[in-house]
């Protein structure tokens, strides 16, 4: 039974979130949609929503939290986990490194000048495309099934692809094709180029909402343990490695700034989503001391491809509630 004091605290948290979402929504006009993917260019960029999930299942939601959007680069987290589960961490890291890069997420430069062909990390396009080729199965559908099964295991519902977004990405994936063929030439891509691209772009086009990614964040916050179901759904080693990569590489080439000023493991996508998490804290006087998962949606993105109002909202929350892991 929830105590009255807990209800009161959660009510205060909801009031704060509503105020902060309303405030930072006004900054959406300073961002832009990811118009290089035509289907994303049509989205209303004034939207902003958030969902916070606590270990007891309590959810605090505000703004446009329920609006569906595509995972885009947040799917790189899922793909990496799925590959590690099926191939093992050591095998995966032979083909993708774990080093941050200051280049844009779709850059090809470092593939040519450092360890030719080996992607720096799985949170950039080159790394995620390589990961897509490592997924179990011999067909596009079989490889995607490992993604679907993993997501369903965590959020308890079967994901679906937004076919309009997928077709839009498929028709404009020229840079990703260049990356894939370069990776294939250097022996890091295990599957056919076009099939691998289809897997990658379809996983990016999976549709979710802030509640879904907040649940995934909650599981990662607890090292792969699902505190609501009281079940270990991911190996601890995989969850911890994933969080480390999110912290160092998850926010494109703004990852260092994000770690310095917000201080949480996170992964963003150009659709405007941000999946982040707060590990449990040793200081029990702090807000969310038992950890939580956070999902944010704000499709107005900045020059790095991250949600502009979403990052501003998250930075405010992290400061007000002292959420940084540092």
Curated annotation (Swiss-Prot):
Pfam families linked to this entry: Glutaminase (PF04960)
Database matches in Gene3D superfamilies: 1.10.1500.10, DD-peptidase/beta-lactamase superfamily
Swiss-Prot/TrEMBL GO biological process terms: glutamate biosynthetic process; glutamine catabolic process
Keywords per UniProt: Hydrolase
E.C. number(s) listed in UniProt: 3.5.1.2
Key word Hydrolase present: yes
Entry keyword annotation includes Hydrolase: yes
Catalysis: reaction(s): L-glutamine + H2O = L-glutamate + NH4(+)
Annotated substrate binding sites: 73, 125, 169, 176, 200, 252, 270
Sample GO molecular function, one term: glutaminase activity
UniProt subunit comment: Homotetramer.
Family membership noted in the UniProt record: Belongs to the glutaminase family.
NCBIfam families, alphabetized: Gln_ase, PRK12357.1
Protein name: Glutaminase 2
Organism: Bacillus anthracis
